[in-house]
Amino acid sequence: MQKSKLNTTLNGLKDFLHQCRRVLMISRKPTRQEYITISKVTGLGICLLGFVGFVIHVPITYLKALIKP
């Protein structure tokens, strides 16, 4: 019983490693232009999230000050 469980686990690991190898074979290093574009989009997303957090934070802070005089 334990031997079959071990074989199942090893087969699962072997399949996973095979899939990882397939992905690595088709992937490539991004070009400089792709890297710059990805960096810009990521930076814009981070700034947008920060702005949304700030917009939520400011009214809540003022409402707390109005409620607890």
UniProtKB/Swiss-Prot annotation:
It is a single-pass membrane protein. InterPro entries: Prot_translocase_SecE_dom_sf (IPR023391), Translocase_Sec61-g (IPR008158), Translocase_SecE/Sec61-g (IPR001901). Keywords: Cell membrane, Membrane, Protein transport, Translocation, Transmembrane, Transmembrane helix, Transport. It comes from the Archaea. The lineage of its organism: Archaea, Methanobacteriati, Methanobacteriota, Methanomada group, Methanococci. Its main location: membrane. GO terms for biological process: intracellular protein transmembrane transport; protein secretion; protein targeting. Component of the Sec protein translocase complex. Heterotrimer consisting of SecY (alpha), SecG (beta) and SecE (gamma) subunits. The heterotrimers can form oligomers, although 1 heterotrimer is thought to be able to translocate proteins. Interacts with the ribosome. May interact with SecDF, and other proteins may be involved. Essential subunit of the Sec protein translocation channel SecYEG. Clamps together the 2 halves of SecY. May contact the channel plug during translocation. The chain crosses the membrane at residues 43-63. This is Protein translocase subunit SecE. Belongs to the SecE/SEC61-gamma family. It is found in: Cell membrane. One of its GO terms (molecular function) is protein transmembrane transporter activity. GO terms for cellular component: plasma membrane.
